[in-house]
Amino acid sequence: MAASAIKRLVKQAALRVQRERCHAQHARMAQRLLASLEQYNGALGSPIQRQARDYAHEVLGSAKYAPWLKVYSAVHGSFVEGWIPGDYYQLVVLPCKNGQIGQATNTKTLTKRLLNSAALPDIAYLIDGIGYAADYSVVSAPALIDLLFAADERIFFKPDRSFQGQGIRILGRGDISPETLARLPDGVFQRPVIQHQIFDALTPNSTATLRLTTAKLPDGSVELRAADLRLGRANDRYVRAVSEIRVPVEMATGVLWSRGFMPDWRQVESHPDTGTSFSNIQIPGFHQAAAMCCRLHQGFPHLGCIGWDIAIDRKEDAKIMEWNARHNSIVFSEATTGPSFKWLGWESLWKR
């Protein structure tokens, strides 16, 4: 057998192993959530479970995609056609629609160059041990420190290739010296966003983050397809995926649902720490934030789906905390406000 054929077979085997690991990981996550949901909502009926398996097999190409469909059904109370499972999104949609270029969104030091937006709260960057101002001009270490704290007592540092709040550091002037700068990885320094007053009652110790998901349509236009508000806990200095509370947003009005979801997807009607109800809260500047994200996505048509983490400041202006086209999970929005991605043809991508 030729060496090229052997390499091809080895690559195919490695891809199969990778896919099976992905399925197994998603199945474990989905099964944990389903068990939690069934504690509060009762067991998911056999007919619904059968619908999920049949739909996964017949429409999405494999019954292995059924676990997330069961979770969505448990949240919704019935099965709905058109849902996209989390592992199908990761294994099929992302490679087809975002490709390798989606990884660029995880390089935070590159974001401003790509988006060219004043909505980014970037102050400076650290790249290969060298400091750069927001316009990518080189600055010395002492000048960089002065620049970072020219207007703020504390700033945020986010390493490249980090997501879900991992690796974030909150730094004061006393925390940074030329020596400590030399030990930091590549990353972006951002100024803190003073959130709109309406969020202070919900999460006073961390900045509430609006997760907006935009998708490219078959005609090339871009639409907002999902939205929810992410809130930190009392002990969190920033919103963390492991502890956050998520509240769906009605996209037509920008109004919060009356119920939010804990990390185990148990539903609550108010923030567990502050006691503030979610009812009748309208996100300030919601439609302007959505329009901005759609406009920026339109200018970056290489990507089929983008998750945007947005903070709303005191003036109702949207600030881009992160964008993600590589690890932007869709399972929460699918379970709560979905199906969010109908009429895009995603359910047929596996046939390519």
Segments from the language model and where they lie:
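Catalytic micro-motifs at enzyme active sites that drive phosphoryl/nucleotidyl and oxygen chemistry
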Residues: 102, 111, 143-146, 157, ...
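Phosphate-binding site of ATP-dependent enzymes
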Residues: 153, 173-174, 178-260
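Short catalytic/ligand-binding loop motif for oxyanion handling, primarily in non-cytosolic enzymes
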Residues: 130-135, 164-167, 221, 235, ...
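Short, flexible loop/turn elements at secondary-structure junctions
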Residues: 159-163, 191-194, 214-216, 231, ...
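Conserved N-proximal alpha/beta basic substrate-recognition cap immediately N-terminal to
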Residues: 20-143, 163
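Glycine-rich phosphate-binding loop of ATP-grasp-fold ATP-dependent ligases
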Residues: 122, 130-131, 154-178
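C-terminal active-site "lid" helix and adjoining low-complexity regulatory extension at the edge
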Residues: 267-305, 312-352
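Intrinsically disordered, low-structural-confidence terminal and linker regions
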Residues: 1-29
